[in-house]
Curated annotation (Swiss-Prot):
Keywords: ATP-binding, DNA-binding, Hydrolase, Nucleotide-binding, Transcription, Virion. One of its GO terms (biological process) is DNA-templated transcription. The gene is NPH1. It is found in: Virion. This is Nucleoside triphosphatase I. GO terms for cellular component: virion component. PROSITE patterns: HELICASE_ATP_BIND_1, HELICASE_CTER.
């Protein structure tokens, strides 16, 4: 490995020796139950507390690994390092009561009143932080130090990244945090299962928060799925991260059952819109391109979900007039669905996708009308009816072309459901409790939980067998968070071993001339994630766990030196133009095995059968009997390929 590793390893052992007296347990004062920390929780707590100059740490842990409890343990024992601390916790507002306040009151009630909470998704809370910032800064002296904890740090970082080269409103707060975190003796602990959310720029801002002024990370450093200056970057960031991910695969990769995590199967449903929905999609496409919504694909996304007679364009309507129009349309659709009551015979045939014979005329007519408006909702109902257990359905749209209309489809097919969204604030916690109840593990009482972005982070679902992604988010991190609501440590322990699985269903809708906004967004997500995965591999390599695994038996240092040096040493900039990587690539045409209708162009490396789009590896040839598989389309040779992730 590298020389610096052994020095950092010796410092880790110094911290472990220094904190050997800390208890492995923490007591729940509400239930009077003593909980033993997991080895990784105890390890990172001791290293973070034991090293004065290791002032920053990222907990890059899977969802459900106990980040909140670990943070509370650190808060409880940080006085081992210094007697007086101000605790400043940045969180999403929805996470204040559960898990944060409940966990603190249970395990550290004596300090619960001495913690300052700031909600980074609340303008009034941020204003409050600005007002108290000066008093916090003035109180930092020889008698007081500051511990900053940031939960779901990717959410905070994404608010600080420049948009269209313009400074975001959150940037001044971000700069204040950097100043506070790097005041002599202070510490900052950041937590996330997905520390990079949208793009590489966020990694720069994350480093700027944790270890400012040491480097500027450039996307150009990633060539052919590798970091060209890996050693320099690694040395600069060594020991910055704690890494605990039992499932390293991204959202699109299937995984087996492992260490309490359910098996994950990934299923793509490629479905065709009705002629009516296809026509409205084409109109929506023209509208998007004529307006500023083209890049966001807004109208096309709405129509891909639900297309009821016409486009719902606001135009010159004010908010009240527009909302009234939507209410009238929804009431009209609601009135129509009240007359639909599918027979049991039809539902059984619908589940098997066998609607050719022996069907009541009324059933088939009603089905055709519902399909005309939304092929996605129809497919979602089929998946739900075929599920052996409970189902989670992610739909970010809450109003007309979203949850509001989807629920009427569920009523038509006699599907029971609860809703967790911004519209159900008063009832959602009680309903989720009923959904998670042990007696509902098979979904017989409540089959589906529909949830929007309001439920994509911070809450847990138990014993779920199917997740349906009805509308794509913009990045893989959001997908990971969505799946993390139900694929969590021990989330399926109450089910028999053979039922500890989760099927993840992606519903991809196409017009009758093969246009698809879902496929466009899916490709964008995969392209961005290929670069983010390179950074995740880097974070694993710099983690205190990776270093300690190699140097756990090295002699501890006698006193701290290295982290103060690392924090103040800037990485040497690399001249990208001096780096030459020679790979011979051949232009080809190919298609994905699951979507042979979409013909793509790429560059093939014949040595490893990997296909590139510019500098990014995007696919790999399908090989059978040592030969690539191909088809002939319009006299063109089209290779068959699968998605590829390095």
């Amino acid at each position: 490995m590298f020389t610096l590793d052994s020095i950092v390893g010796a410092h880790i052992n110094y911290a472990l020796d220094k904190t050997a007296h800390l208890p492995e347990t923490i007591t729940n004062n509400v239930s009077n139950v003593e909980i033993t920390l997991k080895d990784y929780q105890y390890f990172v707590s001791r290293v973070f507390i034991g090293l004065k100059n290791l002032n920053s740490m990222l907990l890059f842990w899977d969802t459900g690994m106990g980040k909140t409890l670990t943070a509370v343990y650190i808060i409880k024992h940080i006085k081992e390092l210094f007697p007086r601390w101000i605790i400043l916790i940045f969180i999403k507002k929805s996470l204040y009561i559960d898990p944060w306040l409940n966990t603190i009151r249970a395990f550290a009630p004596d300090i619960s009143n001495n913690i300052i909470f700031v909600y980074y998704d609340s303008s009034s809370s941020l204003d409050k932080f600005v007002n108290i910032y000066r008093s916090i800064e003035n109180s930092l002296n020889k008698k007081n130090r500051l511990l900053i904890i940031i939960d779901e740090v990717h959410k905070l970082i994404s608010r600080s990244v420049k948009k269209d080269n313009s400074e975001r409103n959150f940037t001044p707060t971000y700069k204040k945090l950097i100043k506070l975190a790097n005041y002599e003796g202070n510490k900052i602990l950041c937590m996330s299962a997905t520390p990079i959310y949208n793009n590489i720029d966020e990694f720069n801002n994350l480093i700027g928060l944790l270890r400012p002024n040491v480097m500027t990370f450039k996307e150009e450093y990633i060539i052919n799925g590798k970091l060209i200056n890996f050693k320099e970057i690694r040395d600069t960031l060594l020991g910055l991260c704690s890494y605990k991910r039992l499932i390293e695969a991204d959202s699109f990769t299937e995984t087996n059952y492992v260490e309490g995590y359910a098996k994950k199967n990934v299923i793509y449903h490629n479905i065709i819109m009705s002629e009516e929905q296809s026509k409205l999609f084409n109109l929506a496409e023209k509208y998007d391109y004529k307006t500023e919504l083209g890049g966001l694909k807004t109208m096309r996304r709405l129509v891909s979900s639900f297309a009821f007679y016409d486009l719902k364009i606001k135009g010159d309507l004010n908010n009240i007039e527009y909302n009234d129009m939507i209410k009238r349309k929804l009431a009209e659709f609601s009135e129509f669905t009240k007359t639909i009551n599918f027979s049991n015979n039809f539902i059984e045939k619908f589940k098997r996708d066998d609607l050719k014979n022996d069907i009541l005329l009324e059933d088939i007519n009603n089905y055709n009308i519902l399909y005309q408006y939304s092929c996605k909702y129809i497919e979602a109902c089929r998946i739900i009816l075929n599920s052996r257990g409970k189902v989670l359905l992610f739909e970010p749209l809450v109003n007309f072309e979203g949850i509001a209309s989807l629920k009427y489809y569920f009523n038509c097919f006699n599907i029971t459901y609860v809703e967790y969204s911004s519209k159900t604030l008063k009832t959602r916690d009680i309903e989720i409790s009923e959904y998670n109840n042990y007696e509902n593990n098979d979904g017989k009482n409540i089959k589906v939980c529909i949830f929007s972005y309001a439920g994509s982070e911070g809450i847990s679902f138990k014993c779920v067998n199917d997740i349906i992604i009805l509308d794509m988010p913009w990045n893989e991190s959001e997908l990971k968070q969505i799946m993390g609501r139900s694929i969590r440590l021990n989330s399926h322990n109450d089910l028999p071993l053979e039922n500890r699985y989760v099927n993840v269903h992606f519903i991809i809708s196409y017009t009758n001339n093969r246009k698809s906004v879902d496929k466009e967004i899916l490709d964008i997500i995969k392209d961005k994630q290929s670069k983010i995965n390179v950074v995740f591999d880097l974070l694993k390599s710099i983690s205190i766990e990776s270093i300690h695994n190699i140097h756990k038996y090295i002699e501890p240092v006698e006193s701290e030196t290295i982290f103060d040096t690392i924090r103040k040493t800037r990485m040497r900039e690399m001249n990208i133009s001096n780096v030459i990587v020679k790979i011979k690539l051949y232009p080809i045409m190919y298609c994905k095995d699951y979507d042979r209708a979409t013909i793509l162009k790429g560059l093939l490396n014949k040595e490893n059968n990997i296909i590139y789009n510019e500098d990014t590896a995007v696919a790999k040839l399908t090989i059978e009997n040592n030969k690539p598989v191909f088809i002939i389309v319009d006299d063109n040779l089209i290779y068959i390929a699968d998605d590829y992730y390095e």
